[in-house]
Amino acid sequence: MSGHSRHDLIIIGAGIVGAACVEAAVAAGLRVAVVESGAIGGGASAAAMGHLVAMDGDPHELALCVYSLQRWQRWASWPESEHQRCGTLWVAREAQELEGVSARVAALAEVGVHAEAVDARGLYALEPALAAGMHGGMHVADDAVVYPPRVAWRLIDEACRAGAQLFAGVRAQALIDGGVRLADGRVLLGPVLVATGVAVPELLPELPMRARKGQLVITERQPPLLRHQLIEMGYAAAAHGADAASVSFNVQPRPNGQLLIGSSREYDVTSTDISPLLLQRMLQRAIAFVPALREVRALRSWCGFRPATADGLPYLGPMPGRRDVWVAAGHEGLGITAAPGSAQLVIDAFLGRAPALSLSPYLPQRALRGDA
């Protein structure tokens, strides 16, 4: 098969980030082509927990989260999102973990996110199933959980109804001057936005991206055990750490009564097989925080690959040295939260508009000159 077609923007990748870019581009009146070799909303979007969270480990990360969470409000109204505002309860297992809580609460308040410190009594009032000996934590009431694959599907479906052209089941083989060549021989002409997560280096080999494998377990349905997304205070350190393999406590109640148990991180592991020893460590960590999980039956486990940059911030913006090539990828574990904001920032910049946030911290050029 061969042929040429011209488009205002060619978006490669239809995970949650790519799908959000498609929506923003179509809303701006662009003639959009979407290329997706696998399932829409597949990859990291399908493997993720679906936690909408104001992550405050880095000011640029937090700014992107807050901007994106505002833009999630419309998507959250869709039945496909399975949106549940369960809130996040950050749990301190050690007394010293409480030392930074007041500063975190203040930092969140500065960007309009309400959070409150809780002592041990308040912690157990919110979640009685926690193990004895916890010291307190932080409660962020407006955080939520969603089901990302169906959101991505709806975004692409609505975009196609509005005129976007979907090239499904075909791989983008190579970027060419002025467009992209597909594996079936067709050539799409126009500016290109690469949003393929861990696969970005296949088209942009000069852009560093590490695959960070994660595993999750889903339980059987059961009477309510937990009401909040529970995360240990040390989660951010594990998420941004450089350890080859790590686990941290992270459990999410799903709207249907199941529990989603995480999380693990492994760098540079390409096998899609479950890592039994790391899975055991992850479950033992969860049971140490919620002993009742020992009696809950696990239904299945799976893994996915987070696209990770060296500095923990995504790549958003034009690619230096390449004409009319843009990128939106590298969100690691925050792609679900950050998708709508990332998309709007990139499309605004593509159109020459002033984005709501400065793109400077996220520009891919930082990785090419060694800043990231």
Residue ranges and their predicted role:
Residues 10-12, 187-199, 343:
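Short hydrophobic core segments
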Residues 23-24, 52, 81-84, 187, ...:
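Active-site substrate-recognition segment that forms the wall
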Residues 273, 280-281, 287-372:
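C-terminal catalytic lobe of FAD-dependent flavoproteins
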